[in-house]
């Protein structure tokens, strides 16, 4: 029955999902990767199925063996529609990625500007959360990207929404120093405006 449930979720077949649940399927069943039907629907951009599953008792915050849930999935894979839906459904913004960051961290690092803007302007997500190596979203956006115009806008967005430019990584290195080390002089100038 679970294979049918996962297939129906992937296809967004709400009628099949309804029938399976009426016949005893577990709405929070897990596949080999610990994915639930709602995560499978989310990964396949089946937004109506995501909403339906959530409204019928699916746990929207359950994470798979890679720490993905629908919210983290949307943040990492630049799916603004999914991120907005999960926030609307009341997802837990404190769920962490496998590296210990919240959804803002990979969105900033990967240059998903619209998601970063949405999260900062519409939620109370922790902009200064540190991951397993002491990196904030601000630090990740500097270290793991190209320093280009999009990243400059993201850096400014983070700083405009109270990212702390004095927080250092676990080795005591500041965002300003990291920007200079990477040769990102424009980002360094932006950070200096907030010091």
Mark where each language-model region is.
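Ankyrin-repeat-protein effector appendages
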Residues: 1-4, 143, 150, 154, ...
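Ankyrin repeat domain, specifically the short helix-to-loop turn at the C-terminus of the second helix
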Residues: 18-26, 51-59, 84-92, 117-126, ...
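Conserved ankyrin/ankyrin-like repeat signature
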Residues: 16, 48-49, 81-82, 114-115, ...
């Amino acid at each position: 029955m679970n294979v049918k449930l996962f297939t129906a979720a992937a296809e967004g077949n709400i009628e099949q999902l309804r029938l399976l649940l009426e016949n005893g399927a577990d709405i929070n069943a897990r596949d080999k990767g610990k994915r639930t039907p709602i995560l499978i629907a989310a990964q396949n951009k089946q937004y109506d199925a995501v909403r339906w599953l959530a409204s019928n008792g699916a746990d929207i915050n359950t994470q798979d063996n890679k720490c993905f849930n629908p919210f983290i999935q949307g943040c990492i894979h630049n799916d603004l529609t999914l991120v907005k839906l999960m926030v609307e459904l009341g997802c837990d913004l404190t769920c962490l990625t496998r590296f210990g960051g919240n959804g803002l961290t990979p969105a900033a690092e990967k240059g998903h500007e619209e998601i970063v803007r949405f999260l900062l302007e519409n939620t109370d997500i922790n902009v200064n959360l540190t991951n397993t190596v002491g990196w904030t979203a601000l630090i990740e956006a500097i270290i793991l990207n190209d320093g280009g115009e999009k990243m400059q806008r993201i850096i400014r967005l983070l700083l405009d929404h109270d990212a702390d430019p004095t927080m250092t990584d676990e080795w005591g290195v500041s965002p300003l120093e990291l920007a200079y080390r990477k040769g990102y002089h424009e980002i360094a100038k932006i950070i200096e405006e907030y010091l």
